[in-house]
Amino acid sequence: MSVMWAATSPEFGLFHPVERRSEVKDLSDRFNDLRSCGQGYVEVRSPTREFPVLSLAFRGDHAVVHLISDAERMFLLVGDGIVPSSAEVEVPIVDDLAAFTDDFVLDTDRAWGVVHDFIQTRAADPLGEWREL
């Protein structure tokens, strides 16, 4: 199965916005490289549709997942309770760190599982509860 994706460059630590089409294994390899670096940002979508786009931003064991459903609507996936109530976590969004409250922070492995499920099903609704921004 192929997927369109763009991600942080492990070599330079900056987001490389040029999308590439590849098999899921290549995306998984990039994600694993970024895990070794400790942080990263990945955007994925179907090769046949511009939307929806799912993004995964992570730093260490903490991640945030965004859903861009169309050119004007964006959502955050509700967190899984990995951080204490009222805690904030910083993750890289494109090339800058952004802070998110515990309401939207997930375990990085769980967030990667969400991305993987999205790639397989091309559907965002079954992935969890979304809050519109």
Where are these regions (language model features)?
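Amphipathic, interaction-prone secondary-structure segments
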Residues: D33-R73
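Acidic, proline/glycine-rich low-complexity IDRs
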Residues: M1-S36, H66-L133
